[in-house]
Amino acid sequence: MEKDIKLVEQVATFKRLPKSDSRWRVAFYYIAKEFWDLEEVFVIIDKTLYEEQGLKIPVFREYKEAEGFQIFSSYIKAREFVEKQGDLFVAANGEKLIGRIRQSAFREVFVPFFAEQNFNYLLNEDEALFVDTFKRLLAVMEASENYIVDQEQEDLLKAGDVQGFFADICKKYIVLM
């Protein structure tokens, strides 16, 4: 929870800086660092794909001129977002479609894969919303661009089945809350 609060404070500071201010680079670094250091992140699961195909695929949404995966720094923020949306992210059985990704899976699988695919992320919501690329997150954290895969995932990648690979990592590493 403390990391989440610190992250929100960093985003708020960043948003107050004028675009001409050189301190934005430092503020950005601290946001990326706090985000990278979260023990777990939370995603909202696409209701249609979950109910029709049993897939736990994170929501990919648009914000202003950017599109990206919606990621939350805490379960509370994810739950508040889901509750504001009515039944849009609630399964027929009443289950809120919120998934958790542990730090190791996020760092070692999701971020490098999303960076390779040139995806963005939208962190949190409302006044704490921050948008950036996974590629820049990897670069700032000086992390490896290689992602860890098991044999089944390696076979999917060798066959060129990127969608199958993505569905598999979501199935294995996203836990519904």
Where are the model-predicted features located?
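An interfacial alpha-helical scaffold signature
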Residues: 1-177
